[in-house]
């Protein structure tokens, strides 16, 4: 080595040691998604919501409030809004099934309706208008130990002969012994028995998540405004409508039942652990200091943030947004430079790494006026519930 090189060696040694001791930067910390200022993201999210609300209501501009009557909202309108809000809250509380669970074969179980000598039936007035069907949730949990394992639930009823056309409605027992409408069916006259099936997957997931012991449904004749006869004409196996309002004794194994399709119990632990690893939802993100992709809190006050006074309920809501880097799954020594170069050539404005985007969104019920008429509307996909890298 020339003398000049020897003189430089003491200066080069610290640099060489620094290169040796410093680990190569893993690709897991890299993302080609541009880093955006948090306040800028919030402002953009607010402006996006402004446009979304007007677009979903098909309004070119906020409606005039000149004709809005003074005072509080009418009680009927407020009751409709509250019931809509409660229904949305109940549905959003339901656990989401995991895509991985759809791969596995489903175990099918039948849970029969509770027999009518159970005291639960004494709490409901016997009527020619309706029949009641209650189920023991302990039997449901024995068949499906975790709500996330439930793939599908059907309420099956064996309809007997029907002489006249009958419009029926199915309701779910709700809080304070109230009833929530689920669906309806128009039954044609028939001389032969026929199985009726109602999809009640969401309802059964709610039951599995709650601590109640007995839950139930009500099948009722449709109440027509121009008809005085609201008698339930259809006979369901296991009941006799009685025409006198009497609930007859249940008979046979073909009484109403729930057909449950669920992923087997032995896979529950695997799916549950996978769910915790993947769930970038509000429960996880709001209680952690996660720096990567996650749901970020954002409350929008309609008056303060949007300058709007025309939305009367709610006054604001938690819109939230997704933010955070989505790491590469490759390491630096396994990246295919030619593939990435070709990708960037054909997609110069795109990211070579996934970006943080919404996965689950919830609706937002609102009350607003059009002229002097109050309206209750449900705006879809307004609340970010969870995020994913995509």
Swiss-Prot record:
GO CC annotation, single: blood microparticle
UniProt-listed CDD domains: TGF_beta_TGFB1
GO BP term (any one): hyaluronan catabolic process
Residue(s) at site: Cleavage: 278-279
Arm domain: annotated span: 75-271
The keyword Secreted is assigned to this record: yes
Placement of sequence motif Cell attachment site: 244-246
Signal sequence coordinates: 1-29
Residues bearing carbohydrate: 82, 136, 176
Region annotated Straightjacket domain, chain positions: 30-74
Key words of the record: Cleavage on pair of basic residues, Disulfide bond, Extracellular matrix, Glycoprotein, Growth factor, Mitogen, Secreted, Signal
Origin superkingdom: Eukaryota
Family: Belongs to the TGF-beta family.
Assembly, per entry: Homodimer; disulfide-linked. Interacts with the serine proteases, HTRA1 and HTRA3: the interaction with either inhibits TGFB1-mediated signaling and the HTRA protease activity is required for this inhibition. May interact with THSD4; this interaction may lead to sequestration by FBN1 microfibril assembly and attenuation of TGFB signaling. Interacts with CD109, DPT and ASPN. Interacts with EFEMP2. Interacts with TSKU; the interaction contributes to regulation of the hair cycle. Interacts with TGFBR3.
Stated name of the protein: Transforming growth factor beta-1 proprotein
Gene name of the encoded protein: TGFB1
